[in-house]
Amino acid sequence: MPNEDNELQKAIENHHNQLLNQDKENADRNGSVIEDLPLYGTSINQQSTPGDVDDGKHLLYPDIATNLPLKTSDRLLDDILCDTIFLNSTDPKVMQKGLQSRGILKESMLSYSTFRSSIRPNCLGSLTDQVVFQTKSEYDSISCPKYNKIHVFQAVIFNPSLAEQQISTFDDIVKIPIYHLKVSVKVRQELERLKKHVGVTQFHSLDHLHEYDRVDLSTFDSSDPNLLDYGIYVSDDTNKLILIEIFKPEFNSPEEHESFTADAIKKRYNAMCVKNESLDKSETPSQVDCFYTLFKIFKGPLTRKSKAEPTKTIDSGNLALNTHLNPEWLTSKYGFQASSEIDEETNEIFTEYVPPDMVDYVNDLETRKIRESFVRKCLQLIFWGQLSTSLLAPNSPLKNTKSVKGMSSLQTSFSTLPWFHLLGESRARILLNSNEQTHSPLDAEPHFINLSVSHYYTDRDIIRNYESLSSLDPENIGLYFDALTYIANRKGAYQLIAYCGKQDIIGQEALENALLMFKINPKECNISELNEATLLSIYKYETSNKSQVTSNHLTNLKNALRLLAKYTKSDKLKFYVDHEPYRALSQAYDTLSIDESVDEDIIKTAYSVKINDSPGLKLDCDRALYTIAISKRSLDLFNFLTEECPQFSNYYGPEKLDYQEALKLLQVNENASDETILKIFKQKWFDENVYEPDQFLILRAALTKISIERNSTLITNFLLTGTIDPNSLPPENWPTGINNIGNTCYLNSLLQYYFSIAPLRRYVLEYQKTVENFNDHLSNSGHIRRIGGREISRGEVERSIQFIYQLRNLFYAMVHTRERCVTPSKELAYLAFAPSNVEVEFEVEGNKVVDQTGVLSDSKKETTDDAFTTKIKDTSLIDLEMEDGLNGDVGTDANRKKNESNDAEVSENEDTTGLTSPTRVAKISSDQLENALEMGRQQDVTECIGNVLFQIESGSEPIRYDEDNEQYDLVKQLFYGTTKQSIVPLSATNKVRTKVERFLSLLINIGDHPKDIYDAFDSYFKDEYLTMEEYGDVIRTVAVTTFPTILQVQIQRVYYDRERLMPFKSIEPLPFKEVIYMDRYADTENPLLLAKKKETEEMKQKLKVMKNRQRELLSRDDSGLTRKDAFLESIKLLESDTIKKTPLKIEAANDVIKTLRNNVQNIDNELMKLYNDINSLEEKISHQFDDFKEYGYSLFSVFIHRGEASYGHYWIYIKDRNRNGIWRKYNDETISEVQEEEVFNFNEGNTATPYFLVYVKQGQEGDIEPLKRILK
C-alpha cells in the first residue's frame, strides 16, 4: 500500500506539472483565472498538514464560507437558465452593469435581481434515454479515487415555447440558438457521509481551484473560445464542488446554417442527381433527413464500447452523406480522418471517413473533451430535429419516414429534475421539483433572488441565508434586510416576521424610499452625512402645507422620518415623530374624552385621569395634550406637558441653547429690558402663525434660558403662570387698580372702562369748566340746552361739574401714581350713584386751591367691607358680598391689607401738584353717602352708566345743538347712535310713519335663547306685525341710521319668577365674536343687502317650520312616550303572547305590525332628514352676510357678573391692542393678564356671565388705550 500511494502521488505531481505548463500557455494567451494553490486542506474535525495526499476526509476549502457570491442549488439552476439571456441582452441598464459581457453565473444576486422578473427563462433539455448514447457520466477522482467521484451531466438550454413562436418555416429552425450546458459535480463521499444535514446547502463562489480538484477537472479550459460563461461553486459543509460551463451552439457558422435550408438541400440533391442518375429528382431530402443523418454520423463513435469493436467508417460515396451534408466538413470541421485504399482488381481509389477513437475517454482527458463535443452535436441535432418534425403537417407523408420516426423515438424532456439528481438532493426535494407546476413566480421576485431563496424554503433556511449574506456583505445588509422583510410579509410567516422585528436594521430599499420621500436622491448624497437638523427641517417643510398634504402622504412622511431616525440613531427625530401633534384638534379632545369648550384645569385633570386609567395610552395622551397646548397657545399647558413628559425638556430644554442663541431666537439684543423681551416673546407666541409644531417649545426654551442667565423674577413668574405679574413690573408698565370702597365694584369696572377710552380720558383730565362758563355760554347761544330731552337746571350743572372734577382727580391719580392702586373719593361714588334729580349742597366759598378730591377737610378715609341687606330691584344684578364668603367680592380685608403698601388714596393728604379747581366742596353727610351706596347696590349697571354719562354731558359745553335743542357733545359723539322706527300699514304701504331715536346701548334678550350674538340682534331688529287702532294691521321695522363710535350691548339676564315671586338670573351662554358686522341692521337702500335680508327671512321661516315639525315628532305625551315610542310599544304588544291567544286573526296582526314598523322607519327617516336639513340651513344662514362688511366693530371690553340675581361680584375684561392684544382682568385693586379663552368662555353652567359688551368701530381701535401711566 505505501508503494501504491507513492506511485499515485508521483502520478499526480507529473500531471500537475503538465497542467502548470498548459496554464502558463493559456495565461500568456488569454489570462487564465486558474492558479496553483497549496496542497493542503482542513478535515471536518481536524486540520491536515501540508503535503498530505488527498484522502477524501479533509476540507480543501476551509474558508469557503467567507466567499461571495453565496447561492443555493435553486439559485444556480435559475442562473443557468437565464445566463444566455443576459449575455444576449440589449437592455441599456443590463449593458450598463456589464452583464451582457460577463453573464450572471459568477455575479452577485444584487447585480441582476431587478431584471429577472422581466425575463422569460430558458428550459433545460436533456436526453432521457441513456441507451442511445450517454449524456451523464461518472468518473473516479484522480486525486482520491477511493472516496471522491466526479459526475458530469450535459444538456441543452433554450426555450422551446419561444422557439415554436419564432419559427414559421424550416429555414427558421437553424436560427434558433441552442446553448449547451455541462455540469461537473465532484462529490467527496466520505465527507458527505459525515455531513450533518441542516437544511438547504449553501454554495460559495470559488476563484481558484485546489490542486487536487484541478487534476480531476482538467478538461475545463476557461480560455476555450466556445465557452460562453462558467462558474465554480463549493458547498461550505462538505466542499461539494460544482463546475458549470455554458457553451455556444454547435453548427454555428453561416455555411452550416445555410446547408440546412430548403434551397441548399435541394441544390445539393440536384447536384447529386446529375452525378447519379438512379436518384429521383422529386424525392428531395427533408431537413429532418439531414439532421438525422448527421446525428447518426456523430452518434456512431459514441456507441463504440471497446477497441475490439470495429470502427464504423463512412464511405465517401455514400448517397445519404453526399445529399444530406457537405462530406468535406467531416474532416475539416468535425475531426474525422479520410482514409483511402486502392482496389486491386479495378485500381479504383476508395475513400472512407474514419471517426475519432473515443473508447478510452475515461482515462484520456483529450479524448473526453472530443467526446463531450460530439455529445453536444448530437443533442443539438436531436432538438433541432424535433423542432423540424413539429412543423410537419399532421397528414404529411414525411411523418412516416425513417428519419422522422428515428427522431421521434429519441426520448427527451424539459425538466429540472436531472439537476437535482446530479446534486444528490434529498428525495423530498426531488419529489417537490419533479412537478414543474410547483415552481412559483415568487422565485423571480428580486427580494427572493437577493437572499438566494426559493418559495418552498423553510423559515430557518431563509434566516440562515440572510445571516450568512449579511455577515459576508455588511455594506449591503440593508438590501438583505429589505429582502427578508418582504419575504416574511409575502409569505405571512410568523417566525420570519418576529425575527425581522427583533433586528435593529434599516433595509436599503426602505432607506432609499425614505430619502426619496424627503426628495433626496440616495444616489447623489452621502447618507452618513445627513444630520437630524437637516432631516427635521425637510420634514417640517414637507408637512407644513396641511391643505396639500394628503393623509396617505403624511403617513408615508412620518414612516420615513421614523426610519431615518432609526438609521441615524437620532432619539430626537424619533421623539419628534412619535409625539407630533394630531392634525385634527378634535382627535386630541376625543383622546382625552373632553369637549373643546372646557378650560385648562379640566384638560389637565382629564389627562391625569386618562393615563391613570389607561397607562398604555400615555403617548396618545401626551400627543393630545401637546396638540391642545399648541391650539390654545397656553404656556400653562406646556408647563404641565413638560412636567408629565420630561422628554420634552430633554429635547427642548434651555440647556440646549446658549444665551446668544436664545436672544437670536427672540430677535432681541442683550441690552433689551425684561419687559421688552416679554413683549416680543408674546408677539411671537400669540400673533405669529404656527408654521412648526415645536416652535412654542423652542420659544419657551429660549425665554427660559434668558430668564436663567438674567436671574429675572419677572420672566420666571411669566413662565410659571403665562401672565405678567404686575408686582414684578415697574408701575409705568401696568394699569392702576381701584380699591373697592363699599361693595360697588361694578363702579370700579365702569371707571376702568371709561379710563381706557382715550378721547374721554383726555377730555376729563383737561377739564377746567365752571358754572359761570355755562351761564355765559347759554346767554350767548340763545339755545335752550337739553340733555336726554329735558332742560338742565343750574343745580344739576354745578353738581355735574363737581362730579367731573372728582373723576378728573381719580384719572390723574391713575396716570401719575407710583402705587399699584388708588382709592376713589366717596364723593365720586356718591355723585355716581345718586340720581341726577337729587340736589347736592355745596359750601359757599369757591375759587380756591383745593385738594385733588375736593372732599371736606374733616372727612376721613374709610375702608369698609360690610355686608348689607337690601331690597332688591327685580331687574338688576346686585353687587353684594355674602356673609358666608361664597361668590363674594374680591376686595376683602386680606387682599386690601396685602396691597395696603401699594394703595394711593385720592384725598386731602395727597400732594396736589398744584391742581386748581374753581369748584365748591360738596357737603355730604355720612348718612347721605351710605344711602347713595345703598342705591348703587340696587341699581342696574346701565342706570349707573346713564347717570355718569348724564353728568359728564351736563358738565360739558355742546359741540352743537340738534334740531330739538338736544346737546351734541363728546359723549354723544362716542356712545350714541340713532335708529329709525317705521310703521307701515299693510293696507296702505305708502303711508309710512317714521321716528328717529337715539340709543346709548342695544338691549338683547337672553330669554329668547339666541344661539349667538347675531341671533340676538336678529330678534332685536326683527320686523313685528302689530294691530294699531289708527292704522289697523301694520309692520314695524327698526334699523340703525347712525352707528356710534363705541357700540354698547347690554345682555338682559335678570327676569322675575312670578310663581316664586323673586328675580332669577339666566346663565345661558351667548356666544359672541371678537369682530362683528352690523350691515344687516343698517337702514339701507342697497338692493343686494335687501335681497339677502329678504332671502334670510324666508330661510328663517322655513327653518321655523322644520324645527316645529322636529319638536312635534320628538314631543312626548302624558305617558312620556314619543310618537315613535308609542308605535314600538304597540308592536311589542301585538307580538306578545297575550295578543296571540286572543281571537284576533294572525294575518291582521301581522299587517298592523308591518304598518307600524313602516311608520317607525318613516319617523326615523324624517327625523334624519330634518336634522340634516336644519343643520344645512342654519349653516347657510350663518354665512348669508359674509360679503357685507362696511360696519365692522371690534370687541374691547366685557363686563362680567358672577353669582345670582340677588348677590354676586363684578369685574371687567379690557383688551389692550397696544400690548400684543392682551386681555386684562380688572378686579378692583387687582389687575391681571388672562388668556383669551377665559374671556370667550361659553361653557354651560358658568355663573360668571357677560352682561355688557363694548365694541369699537373698526378703524378707531386706536382710541382704546387701557394703559396710560406717566411717572416723574
Curated annotation (Swiss-Prot):
Domain USP as annotated: residue spans = 736-1258
Phenotype of null mutants: Increases the amount of polyubiquitinated RNA polymerase II subunit RPO21.
Q: Which SUPFAM superfamilies match?
A: Cysteine proteinases (SSF54001)
Known catalytic reactions: Thiol-dependent hydrolysis of ester, thioester, amide, peptide and isopeptide bonds formed by the C-terminal Gly of ubiquitin (a 76-residue protein attached to proteins as an intracellular targeting signal)
Q: Which residues carry this modification: Phosphoserine?
A: S907
Active site per UniProt: C745, H1209
Q: Under which EC number(s) is this enzyme classified?
A: 3.4.19.12
UniProt keyword annotations, A-Z: Hydrolase, Phosphoprotein, Protease, Thiol protease, Ubl conjugation pathway
Q: Matching PROSITE patterns, A to Z?
A: USP_1, USP_2, USP_3
Instruction: Give GO cellular component annotations, separated by semicolons.
Output: cytoplasm; cytosol; nucleus
Q: Which GO terms describe its molecular function?
A: cysteine-type deubiquitinase activity; K63-linked deubiquitinase activity
* Acidic residues composition-biased segments: 902-911
| Region (Disordered), start-end ranges | 884-918
Q: Which InterPro entries match?
A: Papain-like_cys_pep_sf, Peptidase_C19_UCH, UBP14-like, UCH_repeat_domain, USP_CS, USP_dom
Q: Name one Pfam family in it.
A: UCH
GO biological process entries: cellular response to hydrogen peroxide; positive regulation of mitochondrial fusion; proteasome-mediated ubiquitin-dependent protein catabolic process; protein deubiquitination; regulation of protein stability; ubiquitin recycling; ubiquitin-dependent protein catabolic process via the multivesicular body sorting pathway
Q: How does it assemble?
A: Forms a ternary complex with RSP5 and RUP1. Interacts with RSP5. Interacts with FZO1.
Tell me its family.
Answer: Belongs to the peptidase C19 family.
Q: What does this protein do?
A: Has an ATP-independent isopeptidase activity, cleaving at the C-terminus of the ubiquitin moiety in natural or engineered linear fusion proteins, irrespective of their size or the presence of an N-terminal extension to ubiquitin. Hydrolyzes polyubiquitinated 'Lys-63' polyubiquitin chains in RPO21, producing mono-ubiquitinated RNA polymerase II. Removes ubiquitin chains that initiate proteolysis of FZO1 and inhibit mitochondrial fusion.
What's this protein's name?
Answer: Ubiquitin carboxyl-terminal hydrolase 2
